[in-house]
Amino acid sequence: MFLEKLKLLNSIFEEVESKLSDLSVISNQEEYRELTKQHFYLRPLAEKYIRYSKLLNEIKDAEELQKSKDAEMKEIAFAEYNNLIEKRNQMENEIKVLLIPTDPNEDKNIIVEIRAGTGGNEAALFVGDLYGMYTRFAERNGWKYEVLGSNPTGLGGYKEVVFEINGGKVWRCFKFERGAHRVQRVPETEASGRVHTSAATVAVLPEAEEVDVEIKMEDLRIDTYRASGAGGQHINKTDSAIRITHLPTGLVVACQDERSQIKNRAKAFKVLRAKIYEQRILEHEMRLSSERKQQIGSGDRSEKIRTYNFPQNRITDHRIGYSVYNITEVMDGNLSELVNKLIKADIESKLKENNI
């Protein structure tokens, strides 16, 4: 099965490689870009085809040597055969993963939006905790981040915070964070020691380039106003804050963190483009309802994905039914264990979905 499929993909790879050296193709940017994507996806599979074919031949040779009448030779051949079978099984698992259709957002940077849900001040504090967890996770991985917009409460929390993270594989690691996060803990102001439940929603948007989303100026309403800090007091004497409304979709983005209107405008456009791109992706996924059922989480902000129970020192991811008991470490940015479990579960569901 694998050999025939790899043989076919290898022939397609050779055809794509040939086209990429054709001057008429090189001059056609759209076709060249599409072929480059195919080449990027097929190259590892073509390399596996060569190695896998060679490995199967080595297994055949080891099988023949096991028929030897020489007892010592037979023993060596048997050990070699078992070793090669183990290598084959490992390589087949690697091939399965490579056969999964590539995520078009795999190499994109991201914009993360965290909003306070039910729970008042506790929910706002939880937004701050999640922001700290994600930015420390970014630091651990050498990724850069920058705040694009925030609405602080003045109590160390946020009604909302929006920030971008740039670096390799950020989308792969963060895309499973989309949804509703619930926290259970005793607030510092709670004299009776009663556990309160609060929530925050997280949206993770792949950063869209101009080639991904075209925004027409006639589709926008742009308002300017004075930036305000916690409590509503004005912190700038000029109308530096920006609010952009995308009329066709009704999406609204506001940015006031920078003192410069130009910088706020640039940040707002970046977030708006990502939101429009996300909306298109979700509409496409909705049309593929059977696919959504197979995936680890729908990406819907209202879907409850995780509970952070501080009294029990436990974090539970409800999509995969997995719990960790090191809440302090996780909140300090040590998300790798949870992320790796989610990636593994996602791969398994996609293998099943694609009959691989």
Swiss-Prot record:
It holds the Pfam family PCRF. It is found in: Cytoplasm. GO terms for cellular component: cytoplasm. Disulfide bonds: none annotated. The modification N5-methylglutamine is found at Q233. Keywords: Cytoplasm, Methylation, Protein biosynthesis. Methylated by PrmC. Methylation increases the termination efficiency of RF1. SMART domains: PCRF. The keyword GTP-binding does not apply. GO terms for molecular function: translation release factor activity, codon specific. Peptide chain release factor 1 directs the termination of translation in response to the peptide chain termination codons UAG and UAA. Belongs to the prokaryotic/mitochondrial release factor family. PANTHER family: LD18447P. HAMAP family: Rel_fac_1. This is Peptide chain release factor 1. It comes from Endomicrobium trichonymphae. The lineage of its organism: Bacteria, Pseudomonadati, Elusimicrobiota, Endomicrobiia, Endomicrobiales.
